[in-house]
């Protein structure tokens, strides 16, 4: 005696319990089905036949009892193994067709093969052949709404056969069709049965059930009759095609854990995601807006911060990283400020680490030319000024040693002073300006440097001989501060220590001076700018977070709208991981498109800022980081909706509206 392909023993199914009343739908079903049988399960509405079909097709689990498939206890199978059975052993034909609305006939038929990992070329050819066999060769590209009811049901049958369809479970396949289309579908089922497929027909129509070779009647959750038209039909020799079904147990143990389908599934998921986004264009655009604004904000904020940092660093570095500044300071709050004398300046200049040294005697002063007044920093320097600061004269010349010795009333003005007092047209060289009402002749104009940081503008200064500043303007020979250029920019710390040691001797250990160097100032400014950039980026990231919440919201709505599609995919063999991947891919796709659009918008905004003379510097890490954040946002905020979709009950999903 042959082992039954399907063997049900005492199957019971109950719903409710606890706070709700217990409903017993199946009350002890005993049933065996062999390979090659055409069986009709008939019963009135509410008899439990659809529940029985769901259990037979591994869409649902019984409350109690034993279900053996090819000798394997189905209760011991995990969700992935059940999905494998639905994909490889069963093919479902539903009364409502259950086709995915956004997919073509060909794509609907190919779906089980995608989850089976069938190569694209092979599944395309097989789907086309099945549709051709069922008379739909000219309808392969049509969407379900472009097909008649009979054509949609034939697409459903083709889908059931895509992976072999050893067992066809047809739930009221003619219920929604006219008599002609219904007859065509029943003829197809007859042909499949004659070719060796197990056909299990669920119906309430006894005329339809009469087409089967074996009729099982169910009422109130119990089998009340089981008759075969001809005993020889049940025990007939099995078509060779049906022999494949008895090997399913071995194939189940070998193939249920296979992960070979992920590439095809991923491509299908991307294509499906793009189609859904396009169908709901307006809603997608509103969702994307949050991601676009978030990414663009992060990229632009970081670009502005980086541009400002580079501009400030370039301007500070232009003064030289080998510069040390020496100032007098008060050793304590009650003591007077220390003084660095010119004799000490000369002593410091003798140190081997010192290349050049220059005292500066200066301060803020009022400047007038004609009827124009301006406030500028006026510094008394010596002739080392251009060399120490790498600051050439672009008009005229710098004052000479003779001017320094003679305390000549000559001045070299900065670029901003030139702009304020003389504009672009006038030549300032040779003209006289009043500094604190003392006339000075302009002999040169310094090259433009720009602002170093904050409101400090290096170009808003005037250089005059040190002797002139001391005698004509400030009335003191003592310098305001000392500028020291070291010989080696890499050994500034060593030079600073040598200067400190000498000053300790000269000042008898008194700490009434202060040393700072340009390199340290540059590093400190860099840290400040980095902190500012981080703060700007963090503020902008809030909008990206809001965009992520929008993605989660739209994905939750999508899962709700496409619950039936999820059920269809599960019925055709999708595992929970496949559904998770499907909806996670859609969330990531939203983030990818939003991220790319955000980067494009950011580049456009950056170009506009550059035209407005705002320093902007886009960096690959910043752009890539913002895009990566968008992706991570998609994964994080898309995971919960995708997980919810993957955990849906197949039966509940299929019956949802």
Swiss-Prot record:
This is Pyoverdine export ATP-binding/permease protein PvdT. Residues 6-245 form the ABC transporter domain. Part of the tripartite efflux system PvdRT-OpmQ, which is composed of an inner membrane component with both ATPase and permease domains, PvdT, a periplasmic membrane fusion protein, PvdR, and an outer membrane component, OpmQ. The gene is pvdT. It is found in: Cell inner membrane. It is a multi-pass membrane protein. It comes from the Bacteria. PANTHER family: MACROLIDE EXPORT ATP-BINDING_PERMEASE PROTEIN MACB, MEMBRANE COMPONENT OF TRANSPORTER-RELATED. The keyword Transmembrane helix applies. It holds the Pfam family ABC_tran. ATP binds at residues 43-50. It comes from Pseudomonas syringae pv. syringae (strain B728a). Part of the tripartite efflux system PvdRT-OpmQ required for the secretion into the extracellular milieu of the siderophore pyoverdine (PVD), which is involved in iron acquisition. This subunit binds PVD and drives its secretion by hydrolyzing ATP. The system is responsible for export of newly synthesized PVD after the final steps of biosynthesis have taken place in the periplasm. One of its GO terms (cellular component) is plasma membrane. GO terms for molecular function: ATP binding; ATP hydrolysis activity; transmembrane transporter activity. Its EC number is 7.6.2.-. Keywords: ATP-binding, Cell inner membrane, Cell membrane, Membrane, Nucleotide-binding, Translocase, Transmembrane, Transmembrane helix, Transport. Its main location: membrane.
